[in-house]
Amino acid sequence: MNLDLLGWSDFFTHSFVPYRQQGFSVGRVAIEYRNTYIVYSKQGELAAKVTGKLRHQATQPQDFPAVGDWVIIQTRESEGCATIHGILPRKSKFSRKTVGSKTEEQIVAANVDTVFLVCGLDGDFNPRRIERYLILAWESGANPVIVLNKADLCNSLDECISEVEAVAIGVPILVLSATNNQGIDTLKAYLQPGQTVALLGSSGVGKSTITNQLKGASVQAVQPVRQGDDRGRHTTTNRELILLPTGGLIVDTPGMREIQIWAGDESLQETFADIETLAPECRFRNCQHHNEPGCAVQQALLEGELDYSRFLGYQKLQKELNYLVRKQEQRAQLAQKERWKKIHKAMRNHHQY
């Protein structure tokens, strides 16, 4: 396989130099299973596992390879397998908080150039969900593109596009109907040789259908959505990096029923640029935009310049991010405490001998 077509660039070359001198090879993670990875490399497709050392040193989920990662490998070509010794620095990473009570980062896709945020123009259409995806996209370091699928099922297309334009300020918006192959060509501009695009969206929005149309074959199984709620049945069960005939790469991901935010203030500001632009005009620097006198945001709401549901979405996400920061700080303090416990224990054991 050609590394350049797999997304290799100068960004990774410099980091790999010392490993090349030691005789290691490099590959890109295509599929992630529980304890095994499928890696694309010069030697072809390889089944790979991480070394015991890498597993021992990993303290959190993001220390393990994710789909899209460039990894340092030692190959056993006769067996068609490899051992993963490390991960090269990530150019970008699309992450969310793990589902459940744990405050941990889950990397959905790494080293992505563009993120297609796919939304169905049927019962799935939800501008608030788009806002949540946008925050994660801006945080990732990749460029977001809104893909509105199922245009053939929408009776108010112009109205839906206007709603998206209001929440995705300055973000490209593409409209298509994947099942009819209408508008698919508009996606190809982002899938030049060596470019990686991640498809993200809830189940049933047509991500696998889009992948199949771009691939020109049914590489991903497709199932109909349920009648009544327009929800899909999680056609894609594993994240997978797929090499397209054009030379571009696409990461198809399972539908996300729960979008847990993992981001910082800058991504919130980028997503809600209209509200952030109003904030400096408030009378008080620390204005919370509730009932304070001279609040420019509240004035914009009264005059109809700012949509109230968008403002409520902003407040909700702001609270989520503040809560996440507090949980991260608590987790860091606990980790530091555990670290010092281990150091003191090691020192006591040393003095005993």
From Swiss-Prot:
Its EC number is 3.6.1.-. Zn(2+) binds at residues 282, 287, 289, 295. Its cofactor is Zn(2+). GO terms for cellular component: cytoplasm. GO terms for molecular function: GTP binding; GTPase activity; metal ion binding; rRNA binding. CDD domains: YjeQ_EngC. It is found in: Cytoplasm. GTP binds at residues 149-152, 201-209. One of several proteins that assist in the late maturation steps of the functional core of the 30S ribosomal subunit. Helps release RbfA from mature subunits. May play a role in the assembly of ribosomal proteins into the subunit. Circularly permuted GTPase that catalyzes slow GTP hydrolysis, GTPase activity is stimulated by the 30S ribosomal subunit. Belongs to the TRAFAC class YlqF/YawG GTPase family. RsgA subfamily. NCBIfam families: ribosome small subunit-dependent GTPase A. Monomer. Associates with 30S ribosomal subunit, binds 16S rRNA. This is Small ribosomal subunit biogenesis GTPase RsgA 2. It comes from Nostoc sp. (strain PCC 7120 / SAG 25.82 / UTEX 2576). The gene is rsgA2.
